[in-house]
Amino acid sequence: MATLLQLCQPFDHAVMAAIQQLSGAMMDKIMLVFTFLGEETFAILLLIAVYWCWDKRIGEYLLFSLYTAMSLNGLLKDIICRPRPFLNDEFSDLRYVKVKGLLVDTEHLSSSWSFPSGHSQTAGSIYGSLINGRKLGIKVCGIAVILLVMLSRVYLGVHYPTDTIMCA
């Protein structure tokens, strides 16, 4: 798998460079909001809200989905051991949005692996589960959130595109 990801580096670099051309102070803030939608903390709060305010069975289903995704994510990160783009010399020409605060913990990011993207996997498991069997409007919104979380992780420079594509 690591060799396959290595072969994807030219693709990853080209896509990251194209996405980061959108950069700016306002876009940084927008992308941080999209990233927050893939945070485990937000997913747990959403799960609790669904359980208590909407449907207990769906809340339990989301809990199982999130737990499974989080467990697999940690296991895969430890098996693949792919460094983050901002730690990869081949990607040194790209930007990395350094933010102090709750949303992006740079110390944690520097000591954790890139593949697979936990935010994208969380978004895929939660929003993907929520759209299952729903009306078209809900499906479109769920898919949009998943894609925006994936985009935000690449834009912020904390994941390669393949990290987000292969796990969402």
What role is predicted for each listed range?
Residues 1-43, 73-108:
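N-terminal transmembrane-helix/juxtamembrane module of multi-pass inner/ER membrane proteins
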Residues 37-40, 62-63, 137, 141-144:
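Alpha-helical transmembrane segments
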